[in-house]
Amino acid sequence: MSENPFDLTGKVAIVTGTSRGLGQYFGRALARAGADLVITSRDPATLAPFQAEIEALGRRALPLPLDVRSSDSIQAMVKAAISHYGKIDVLVNNAGCNVRKPALEVTWDDWNLVLDTNLRGTFFVSQAVARHMIPRKYGRIINIGSVTCVAGYAGLGPYGASRGGVKQLTMSLADDWGVHGITVNCLAPGWFKTQQNAVMYENREWVEYLCDRIPLKRPGQPQDLNGAVVFLASDASAYVTGQTLLVDGGISTGATRALPKKVR
């Protein structure tokens, strides 16, 4: 074992949903810590630039197709990853989606899309990877959640429900697989600007409203997540499992939200 508990040299990490957004930041952070990667997307052709970026860091990156709503796709991805690397040490369940609508406008299909992707997908990818981790008595599973797992936001009903489910699932899987040396934790970002929500951050009034409610007075930057994902993927977190780590600038405290602005 390295003297540096955050060192991931020799580890293999799967990061789902790496065609854009936070998934790529998670992948970069793990690669810089020494891990080789499996990167996934429903269309693996979109992964070529990211693959090249990881390889430029001196790490390996295997691009694979993955639709987390398909059992066959999940099984094929895990089989290909093990065939290529021989093992899986770390899983980052990042693939997800959102439908932002008032509750009365949410359709049956909207609900199924979000829950099938964010919750069911997280479970069945974890299950498939755990089948390989259990005989090796080692594994780090990181489920990507959201501040919506602890706070309610209008227009995010299905999304919040899915992330709340991921938080609960994390605790259940941690209890189930801890005996096998597998830790399962949830990394829950707060409000971060990504390609998916960039249009929201063009509204200055909304950004001011948001920052007024964040104790650190700014939205998150993707690099703010680097330390958390490396911590949860590494031996530094060997005795941490079943936990949800909120990286949200403190917005989940609700404290500044309750005070008049002039008091703050």
Q: Model regions: which residues?
A:
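Active-site helix of classical SDR
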Residues: 126, 162, 170
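Alpha-helical segment proximal to the catalytic Tyr-Lys
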Residues: 131, 175-176, 238
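Short, small/polar-rich loop/turn modules that mediate ligand/substrate recognition or access, typified
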Residues: 178, 183, 240-242
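Substrate-binding pocket helix/loop in short-chain dehydrogenase/reductase
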Residues: 102-103, 107-115, 141, 210
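Conserved glycine-rich cofactor-binding loop
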Residues: 12, 19-21
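Residue(s) in the substrate-gating loop at a strand-loop-helix junction
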Residues: 146
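C-terminal substrate-recognition "lid" of short-chain dehydrogenase/reductases
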Residues: 123-126, 138, 218-247, 252
